């Protein structure tokens, strides 16, 4: 009976792996962190750009999802070549996934716009912390939970990004390969696949008057065998210094956003998600914080970027 209970606990922990392997983590402030969803974004902005994002989903619930994203990118060779480096940490329950991605992009310049083609390579490490499972009231030793399990995968992504001063649109697949983790030690025989996810995003910046800009944007997610999800957002900016935004996620969530250009090179962002489903008091809230740095050549002036 005790062994059966242990097996059930392990299988429950693997549910997080299956869900995480089938869909990449979502971000409310995707429009300010383009490299996280499209490798072709690398080198599309002025100077050296670095982003750090933290997302806490359903705080107050043990084992709730948490995501940390850090990336940096810049352009080279007269802005024809872009390169970027990303790190992602996703945690849910006793499972966590660490991913390092190296992206490269080639930018074609037109009269008033650019078109970029990007590729990326991903290395992911999955870890199951069985030693963190509370399997008995007295927390007595059990060899079933003595070891932690891990598995690694390699994947590749691709994307296209078209952008101008007032408009942008992109199509990407951050991970193309169907890596099957079902036969690995960490799944315990449960189905776990890295299924490709197609991402489509677009946005337009409308100058309502000399001091106010309005930016509608959309992100569409499509995974084979799953419903199509989308995020629809509208952000308003005053003097490109402070911005307020609202959004709707088709998977039943409302989003509120606040941004502030605290320094010519530093932007702060905060997003609050409110779940519309009946998941309980704590499971209805998600918080997201973004810190963005833009560093140009010494003495150069860089205009605040709205995407």
Please identify what each model-predicted range represents.
Residues 4-16:
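Sec-dependent N-terminal signal peptides
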């Amino acid at each position: 009976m005790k062994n059966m209970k242990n097996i059930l606990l392990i299988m429950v922990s693997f549910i997080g792996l299956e869900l995480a392997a089938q869909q990449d983590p979502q971000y409310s402030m995707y429009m300010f962190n383009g490299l996280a969803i499209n490798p072709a974004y690398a080198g599309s902005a002025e100077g050296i750009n670095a982003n750090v994002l933290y997302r806490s989903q359903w705080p107050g619930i043990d084992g709730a999802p948490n995501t940390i994203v850090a990336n940096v990118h810049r352009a080279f060779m007269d802005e024809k070549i872009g390169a970027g480096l990303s790190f992602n940490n996703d945690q849910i329950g006793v499972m966590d996934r660490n991913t390092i991605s190296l992206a490269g992009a080639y930018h074609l310049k037109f009269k008033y716009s650019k078109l970029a083609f990007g590729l990326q390579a991903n290395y992911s490490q999955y870890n199951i912390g069985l030693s963190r499972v509370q399997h008995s009231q007295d927390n007595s030793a059990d060899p079933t939970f003595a070891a932690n399990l891990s598995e690694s995968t390699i994947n590749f992504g691709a994307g296209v990004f078209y952008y101008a001063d007032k408009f942008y649109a992109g199509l990407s697949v951050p991970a193309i390969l169907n890596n099957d983790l079902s036969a690995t030690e960490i799944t315990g025989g449960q189905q776990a696949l890295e299924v490709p996810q197609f991402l489509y995003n677009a946005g337009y910046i409308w100058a309502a008057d000399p001091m106010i800009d309005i930016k509608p944007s959309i992100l569409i997610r499509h995974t084979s065998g799953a419903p199509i999800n989308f995020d629809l957002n509208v952000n308003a900016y005053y003097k490109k210094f402070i911005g307020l935004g609202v959004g709707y996620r088709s998977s039943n969530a409302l989003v509120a956003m606040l941004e502030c250009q605290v320094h010519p090179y530093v932007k702060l962002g905060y997003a609050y998600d409110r779940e519309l489903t009946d998941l309980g008091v704590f499971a209805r809230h998600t918080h997201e914080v973004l810190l963005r740095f833009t560093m140009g050549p010494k003495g150069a002036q860089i205009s605040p970027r709205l995407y």
